Amino acid sequence: MYAEAERLKDNGQDVEAIELLVKLLEIDPQHVLSHLTLARLYTRTGQHDLAIAHNQKACELEPNDSFNFTAMSVTYQRAFAGTGERKYIQLAEDAMAHARSMGN
């Protein structure tokens, strides 16, 4: 199911990929890759609040994975670019600092 969602994403079928990933998370709400992929897709479609929520969930599920916090920083940066809301600048910096402090 996840592989199919990735294929849809790669083919630019964002809506279909989102629908499939949401279904996957209904089955397995702890599937971190689905949360990270939804964060990317929601960012691409300008749904920054949803992107942030899914990236935060990935960080909660795998709090020792620095990649998740690096991705969180990027999600915040793109939220700032898409909305102009300055609060996202500090949040992006904080997430990146956290990722760097983990050293893995």
What are these regions (language model features)?
Residues M1-K23, I27:
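Alpha-helical segment of the N-proximal tetratricopeptide repeat
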